[in-house]
Regions:
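N-terminal signal peptide c-region/cleavage motif recognized by signal peptidases
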Residues: 11-13
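Noncatalytic, solvent-exposed loop/strand surfaces
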Residues: 15-471
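Sec-dependent signal peptide recognition
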Residues: 1-7
Length: 471
């Protein structure tokens, strides 16, 4: 029996770990063995497993692969064997409702998180669930309904002995921690400033002390104690919509945010104060602005975001929030990590190391790899920057490709992998020059971020999961 256990442990370890959205602490980086640059249906393919649709990314833990999907309108967590891709089990989650979603979102967008023994999944149409590695349900926690204009897309993470979930929405945003073992709520803290974001947090481990949970929000980023949810550290100065995952490299944290093109520096427009708006547009003199009263066509297109209560009118606090939203600037911001309470004045300038504000992505998160920042925007413009100084190394579309990107870049074995919506996975040599090694077409759409573990590259398309490696 002892020999069997050792073999099983080694077998699980051999497949490596990529146990949450974007892998080790959300960095998108693997210290994996050799990875192929060229791959496809007839090259470097270890296996292909057809799967129902879903936008969640594959994760790998304990020799198992986990992801979520929707099949015949039902919500499922899938477990695959890492070695051959065989489906080990699938478990259905209740579907209490159908949340409204942006066309690029999906009911199975959130990525699971796992340790060697258990997996934790989140479906916005139900809540949180946990299963053993063999598919036995351990607990479930109904949550919602939610009110995010895009639909909820954030993924859970593990911190110490809790599962953490950030729910940023149009109203009543919060961060929640539940016990890994029993699914009971340990703490829940409001995030009153947070709007419709989708940024999955990262964890700062502190030996002998509770970990910090680093979670971007509208206009700011907070570090919460995993023990009780106390806000310990924070900086201000971020955009209003945060969807990317922050990346910690050394003592710096990198995070990008994009709201609208009108939040780019130089494209912002002057907006009237509340009193000026009332004087101009409040024709019925009721102290509010009805949609039909609003005369500015540019502002009217954002009506659904401004009318946060959904009552068909704008009131003073909603307009002031809109002014703050439109005053914030898109950008990649790099901050120095701090000690507890050292930003109590709320002044981010003392912590800001550098920022960059051109071709900023809305959805893809960045990668910091071998002292270079790789920032890929939704339209396929790749920016490489010196990680220490922010000096621009190169900004260009990937050579010969004109693609949209919703998946985030990942890195390993001296290579950068970029998976486009149309199903082309470009492979670049690591470095600021953006040297293209190969462009591999899978002929299937991709929304999910690839995973790297144990010398294998896992790519999920809308219809299958591929495993590529050196043969």
């Amino acid at each position: 029996m002892r020999i069997v256990c050792v073999v099983l442990l080694l077998s699980g370890a051999a497949w490596g770990q990529w146990d949450r959205f974007r892998g080790p602490n959300g960095t998108g980086v693997s210290e994996s063995a050799a990875l192929p640059a060229e791959f496809g249906a007839g090259k470097s393919l270890i296996w292909r497993q057809p799967l129902p649709a879903g936008h969640s990314s594959p994760i790998i833990a304990g020799g198992r692969i986990y992801l979520t999907a929707v099949e015949d309108g039902r919500l499922y967590t899938f477990c695959l064997e890492a070695g051959g891709g065989r489906i080990q089990w699938k478990q259905e989650a209740p579907r209490s409702r159908r949340e409204k979603l942006h066309t690029l979102n999906h009911p199975a967008s959130p990525t699971p998180v796992a340790d060697d023994d258990n997996v934790y999944t989140f479906f916005p149409d139900f809540g949180l669930l946990s299963y053993t590695r063999d598919g036995k349900e351990r607990w479930r926690l109904p949550l919602g309904p939610f009110n995010n204009v895009y639909g909820i897309g954030v993924s859970p993470v593990l911190a110490d002995d809790v599962v953490v979930l950030v729910i940023d929405q149009d109203r009543n945003s919060f961060i929640l921690a539940v016990g890994r073992g029993d699914g009971k709520v340990r703490w829940q803290k409001p995030r009153p400033e947070a709007l419709s974001g989708a940024s999955t947090p990262v964890v700062i481990e502190r030996p002998g002390e509770p970990s910090w949970i680093l979670a971007p929000s509208s206009f700011r980023m907070d570090a919460y104690s995993a023990r009780d949810g106390e806000a310990i550290w924070w900086v201000h100065g971020l955009p209003s919509e945060m969807k990317s995952v922050p990346v910690i490299a050394g003592d710096l944290v990198y995070v990008s945010g994009f709201n609208t093109p009108e939040n780019d520096p130089g494209r912002q427009v002057a907006l009237p104060t509340w009193q000026e708006l009332l004087a101009r547009d409040d024709s019925n003199k009721d102290g509010a602005i009805q949609q039909e009263e609003l005369s500015d066509a540019r502002t009217k297109k954002y009506w659904g975001f401004i009318d946060t209560r959904g009552r068909g009118k704008i009131e003073e606090d909603e307009w002031k929030l809109h002014l703050s939203v439109m005053a914030a600037e898109n950008g990649l911001y790099t901050f120095q990590l701090g000690s507890p309470g050292d930003a109590t004045a709320g002044d981010a300038t003392a912590k800001l190391v550098w920022k960059y504000q051109r071709a900023v992505p809305q959805l893809p998160s960045l990668v910091v790899y071998r002292d270079v920042v790789y920032m890929l925007n939704d339209r396929g413009v790749l920016t490489t920057l010196d990680a220490a100084t922010g000096r621009l190394l190169r900004q260009d579309r990937v050579r010969g490709l004109s693609e949209n990107y919703y998946a985030s870049p990942v890195a390993g074995d001296g290579k950068i992998f970029l998976a486009s919506h149309s199903g082309v996975v470009a492979v670049l040599r690591a470095g600021g020059e953006q040297e293209l090694l190969a462009a591999n077409s899978l002929d299937e759409e991709i929304f999910a971020t690839p995973a790297i573990a144990g010398g294998r590259l896992y790519v999920r398309t809308v219809s299958a999961l591929y495993c590529f490696g050196m043969l």
